[in-house]
A protein has these predicted regions:
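Positively charged n-region of N-terminal signal peptides that target proteins for export
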Residues: 1-4
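Gly/Ser/Thr/Pro-rich low-complexity, intrinsically disordered segments
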Residues: 6-7, 17, 22-65, 72-79, ...
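Repetitive helical segments and hydrophobic/amphipathic motifs
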Residues: 11-12
Length: 477
């Protein structure tokens, strides 16, 4: 239609050159690409980004006539500019830790709307500047929000949201009074041989009010970390690492666990390679009833069933584990030390978790340590944790102990648009913020999960629940 008009206008102009009677003036909008010369013009949108604020600048040809409103729980900033036009088709791309999107729209020929979708209800200031004319939007990058509520007497829950120059962070925090709630370590399926289990089902099977994932584990469900449950060893590691001990006086203690296991038979000492884990080449593995009813081993080893300090059976594979006994499973060179052992021989099994935690009835092996006596104390290097745990931001699960003995269970989402995750140091700082004086790290990544009253509170980074090897649960006393 515009082309037809231009063609007709050209003809009129040509005729106008022949006769003044037919002369015509070119409209303002044709001379300015569709914008009236009487209108204010938005010619450019540009950004300025610092550690403390994001600045959005609209370059104008005249002073702005504008209005501002907030929508979507104050996370959306809407700026309407009146008696203005623009040739801009869209706002320039913006990579920001605080803004999701910027949308530029027009209404009719004289209204322009700019929508700024923020990740949180950030503080924003909108103002004008002259010489040259500009409309400026300053968005402060620091925002923090806590949404606390009491679940029941002795149990409080807080959803924590923070946005700053690092990005958006979302965490879920439970604070439990141990005089009203029991904290327990429970296995997936109640045995290691059962394999892994999703946390929601694990919590339900124990009638738990709340639960978080526990320590590290292998794909078969065996635990990676020095772990004891109700006096029996559940899993071990070669590394000396921070563990949580349930002490005889009822207190919780964070300290270094050091597993040492030895079998004494016929005057010889044979050191254990591990407990309740797959038997490898030349290994000596101890199985107890925490593992399950049977060892599940293959026929390439020899197994000695022990009850009340004596060998009661010698098998080749998949031995039955007595309720009050153990099975010593050996392979390769380890078999040489047991070559002369026969049924009825006395055998001694010694286990120790180190001077600080050996008296604990239950030990949760994980790490590293994060807080000690109210101060940041991250021991990832000393405890020889690999880079996927020690470095970078990730989803995290952590436990803290307050000065009054209350416990903090914390899950932090990561690797998602609503939450960047935390480093170990940032995890320690967040525990500290919620009042913990001592704290340590549990398994994280896709395992990080919190269940409260049968509902998953966080957003696991796998997109759904990852089956885990163990969980820490809260039950009412």
């Amino acid at each position: 239609m515009k082309r037809l008009f231009i063609g007709c206008l050209t003809l009129l102009l040509m005729l106008g050159n022949m006769s003044p009677t037919w002369a015509a003036k070119v409209p303002d909008w044709l001379q300015t690409g569709g914008i009236s010369t009487s209108q204010n013009v938005l010619s450019n949108i540009r950004y300025g980004d610092t550690n403390t604020r994001l600045r959005i600048v609209l370059d104008l040809s005249a002073a702005a006539n504008y209005s501002v409103s907030r929508e979507n729980n104050d996370t959306r900033l809407v700026v309407n500019l009146n008696n203005i036009a623009t040739t801009l088709q869209e706002a320039p791309d913006l990579r920001s830790n605080v803004v999701k999107d910027i949308i530029l729209g027009t209404y009719g020929s004289d209204t322009v709307q700019l929508i700024v979708d923020m990740k949180a209800p950030m503080e924003a200031k909108v103002y004008t500047m002259a010489n040259p004319h500009r409309l400026v939007i300053d968005i402060q990058k620091e925002y923090e929000e806590m949404q606390p509520r009491q679940i029941m007497p002795g149990l409080n829950y807080t959803r924590y949201l923070r946005v700053d120059n690092r990005g958006m962070l979302t965490a879920y925090v439970l604070e439990a009074d141990r005089s009203k709630f029991d904290l327990q370590l429970v296995l997936a399926g109640d045995s290691i041989a059962s394999g892994r289990q999703k946390l929601k089902a694990l919590a339900s099977s124990h009638q738990a009010v709340a639960a978080v994932n526990g320590g590290y584990f292998a794909l078969d469900g065996s635990l990676i970390g020095n772990t004891r449950i109700n006096g029996q060893t559940a899993g071990t590691t070669y590394f000396d690492r921070t563990s949580l001990g349930f002490m005889p006086d009822g207190t919780l203690k964070l300290a270094t666990s050091q597993y040492y296991g030895v079998v004494e038979i016929a005057g010889q000492k044979v050191y254990l390679s591990g407990v309740n884990c797959p038997r490898g080449e030349n290994n000596t593995i101890l199985y107890n009833r925490v593992f399950g009813n049977y060892t599940g081993t293959n026929e390439f080893g020899t197994e000695y069933v022990v009850q009340k300090g004596k060998v009661i059976a010698i098998n080749q594979a998949n031995s039955f584990i007595p309720v009050d006994g153990q099975v010593i499973s050996v392979h390769g060179k380890a078999q040489e030390a047991f070559a002369k052992v026969k049924i009825g021989d006395k055998i001694s099994i010694g286990e120790n978790f180190g001077p600080e935690l050996d008296s604990a009835s239950t030990i949760v092996g994980a790490g590293p340590e994060l807080l000690r006596n109210g101060q940041l104390h991250v021991t990832a290097l000393q405890e020889q944790f690999p880079a996927d745990i020690a470095k970078g931001r990730a989803p995290r699960t952590a436990l803290g102990i307050k000065a009054d003995g209350k416990i903090i269970l914390m899950v932090i989402d990561g690797r998602q648009s609503h939450s960047i995750g935390t480093t170990l140091t940032e995890t320690a700082q967040l525990l500290q913020k919620f009042g913990a004086v001592n704290g340590f790290n549990l398994d994280g990544g896709g395992s990080s999960e919190m269940v409260l009253q049968g509902q998953i509170l966080n957003s696991p980074s796998d997109g759904g629940e990852r089956p885990v090897g163990s969980g820490l649960i809260l039950t009412r006393r």
